[in-house]
Structures are given as structure tokens and as C-alpha cells.
Amino acid sequence: MDNTMIIDVHTHVFTSNRPFSATFLAEASRARSTPIDMITRYADYRATAANCDVTICFGGKAHLVGLWVDDQDVADYVKQDPARLIGFLSLDPTQPNWQAEMEYGHQELGLQGIKLMPMYAGFLPQDQQLDPLWRYAQQHNLPVLLHTGTTFVAQGPIETTLPRHIDVVARRFPEVRIIMAHLGHPFEGECVAVIRKHPHVYADVSALHYRPWQLFHSLMLVHEYGVWNKVLFGTDFPFTTVDASLTGLRSLAEVKIDRFSLPAEKIEALIHRNALELLGLPHPGKATA
């Protein structure tokens, strides 16, 4: 694969405000101090993503906090640009029929990975009741992306989102490709420790560039532990964009604090990392050619 490609592993599909409870929308606006438009429009994404070649997208299911995106919405979104979009299904394993939803999303809708939101839905990813999920992902080579780190939602239990829980999962299901979102912030040290020890566990840098000091510190941990190769590019659209994320990441190469700095070539390698190969996903353009 061309090493100049950019693959965004973390974008959302919210085709309307219907998936959100009023409380969820209010808390999202409170976190930004201003009302936020949560609706994703693919034309808006592409307008700020001219250099992005492939994009992974997903909805989200978390009954606890009032978020529920039907997987059909994601499948329909992918149809807008099947040569560049890869859709993941979402699951809330605290709710009935999640196993049937998993099989339907994968086998009938053609979605190619799984998105989990442990903190938003209120479950531990290593709970043995989720073993059928991890076995299915391992059997069918479905990568699993989990929200890790903090949230603006008051009802989201932080203890369910710690990166250490993925260590347990990866020891039991070592062949599953796992992505921990947001570098597990503010628990980046734990996240780095976990991606370092497990060959198929990765992290993305989505939604971090607007906290530049924190991201600089996080990537210094990545640098010192030698795990640049385990970190993937992602945005968290619609909360930010490809262009803003690229600018934010590249600006960190200009920062020097005492004797500490981040190598520009490592940041560029992160931006152009072949996430599809690492996650075992086919290029959608080749699949539809």
C-alpha cells in the first residue's frame, strides 16, 4: 500500500438527533460550552478530508446514557462512498438480542468490525458474558474498537473504561485486533503499557489535538516506550476534522521542552500508518472495483 495514504480509523455516523436522549445532547453541549451539531454529513467530512483515502465509521449503542444508532444507518452511510468507507457495527451487550444484532450487522449488512462503548453502556469488556462477542470477532477476523478514557456524560462509569481491562481480553483472545480509542486519555500510561505487550492491540489519537500539552506528553510516552508502530490516526468526526487533526499533530513536531521533542518523521509515520493491513481489513476501493 502507498505509504502516503491516510486512513482515519475513528469517525461517527449520526444521521439525525434521533439516536440521542435530551440529556445526552445537553451534556455534550455543556462539555463544549456551546451547543454542538452532532449530525454527521459525509459531504462535510470530505470537505475537510481531501487527503484522507479510507475512513472507518460507526454509530454507537449505549442504553445507559441514551445513545442508540441503528446499524442500518451505518450501512446506508457507507453506500455514499463504498470505495473509501468501511462500516463497523455497534453493540450494547447489556441489552437483549445483542448477539443476534452482531450476526445481522456482520452477515446481512456487511459491516466489517465492532464498536463498543463500555463506559457509556456500563459494562466491563472482560466480563465472561461477553465471551461470545470476542470469540465471534476472533473467528471472523473482525477488529474491535472500544472507547477508552474519559467522557462528558455524568452517568458513564469511569472504572469500566480503563485500558487495563483490555489486557485481560487480549490475554484470553490474543488474535483479535483491538483499538483503544483516544489513547485511553487521561490514562495514557496504562494504554501504552497494554499496546506494548500485546501484538494485536493498538490505540488511536482521535480527539486529542485540541489538548496539545496532553497530546505532547502522551506521544512522549509512546516515544520513550518505543510503540509508535502501535498508534493509529483517527479524528472523532464530527467532534473534529481530518484537516484540524493533521495540523494539530504536525504542530507538535515544533514543540521543544528542555531536551524533549517529538521526531517529525515519527508523527508523519503515524499519520500514514497502514491501519488496514494491521487490522486485517481489505481496502474498500479494491473490494468494490
Segments from the language model and where they lie:
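Hydrophobic/aromatic residues located in beta-strands of well-ordered beta-sheets
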Residues: 6, 55, 85-87, 144, ...
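Alpha-helical scaffolding within the catalytic cores
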Residues: 37-45, 69-75, 98-101, 163-165, ...
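Conserved, mostly hydrophobic/aromatic
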Residues: 10, 74, 114, 137, ...
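Active-site environment of divalent metal-dependent phosphoester hydrolases
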Residues: 12-17, 62-65, 93-97, 121, ...
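Short aromatic-enriched loop/helix-cap "lid" or pocket-rim segments at secondary-structure transitions
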Residues: 16-23, 68-70, 101, 156-158, ...
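Mid-to-C-terminal alpha-helical segments outside catalytic/metal-binding sites
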Residues: 1-54, 227-232, 244-289
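Active-site gating/metal-coordination segments in enzymes
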Residues: 54, 64-160, 201
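Catalytic pocket-lining loop regions of alpha/beta-barrel enzymes
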Residues: 112-113, 126-233
